[in-house]
């Protein structure tokens, strides 16, 4: 896998929103983004459901608190305690109802004005399963034995309609995985109290 510098342009924003506190990273994988966050001086609480990914992340970013847990389990942060949550390509494995519930739980751990920065599979991500697979529900397909959701801008707007203010929504392409991966990059703040 190639290095993906996507977080670099966001670091000043993340540092400001974190306000000296920890960043929670959902689905940290092997810890590449974890290491980037640490290098920017941000304390990190990260988790992934795959034990081998957690082991790799702990080796790459030993200063971070990294746990093995499922995104559907309770988060390792108290309600209203965080200024930033990062979720790069980790929110797309679930039904629409589960996805909404996860996003609501992310909102609950953020303080008012806190930032969620996420990347989501885009509906035109042809190399990684957006078309030609059995549908489970609209925008959710069974790809190689695993459910994968592919978002369009309308779905993102609906997902973050209640209790969020979208600051940035843009299509992007990552070259981390060998072939171009189409995705949506979303930054939104927790609105209200």
Features from the language model and the residues they span:
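Short, conserved catalytic or interaction motifs in soluble domains
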Residues: 96
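Class I (Rossmann-like) S-adenosyl-L-methionine-dependent methyltransferase catalytic domain
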Residues: 1-24, 29-78, 101, 115-193
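Short catalytic micro-motifs in class I SAM-dependent methyltransferases
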Residues: 89-93
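A short glycine-rich, Lys/Arg-flanked "PGG" loop and its adjoining helix->strand segment in the class I
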Residues: 100-112
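A conserved beta-strand element that flanks and buttresses the S-adenosyl-L-methionine
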Residues: 86
């Amino acid at each position: 896998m190639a290095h993906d510098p996507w977080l670099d342009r966001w670091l000043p924003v993340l540092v400001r929103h974190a306000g000296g506190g920890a960043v929670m990273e959902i689905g940290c994988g092997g810890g590449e983004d974890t290491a980037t966050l640490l290098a920017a001086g941000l304390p990190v609480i990260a988790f992934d459901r795959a034990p081998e990914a957690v082991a790799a992340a702990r080796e790459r970013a030993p200063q971070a608190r990294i746990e093995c847990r499922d995104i559907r389990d309770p988060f390792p942060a108290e309600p209203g305690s965080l200024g930033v949550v990062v979720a790069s390509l980790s929110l797309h494995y679930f039904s629409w109802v589960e996805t909404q519930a996860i996003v609501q739980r992310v909102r609950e751990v953020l303080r008012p004005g806190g930032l969620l920065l996420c990347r989501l599979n885009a509906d035109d991500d042809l190399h990684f399963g957006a078309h030609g697979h059995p549908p489970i529900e609209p925008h959710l397909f069974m790809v190689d034995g695993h459910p994968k959701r592919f978002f369009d801008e309308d779905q993102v707007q609906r997902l973050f309609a209640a209790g969020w203010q979208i600051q940035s929504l843009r299509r992007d392409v990552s070259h981390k995985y060998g072939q171009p991966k189409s995705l949506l990059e979303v930054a939104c703040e927790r609105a209200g109290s």
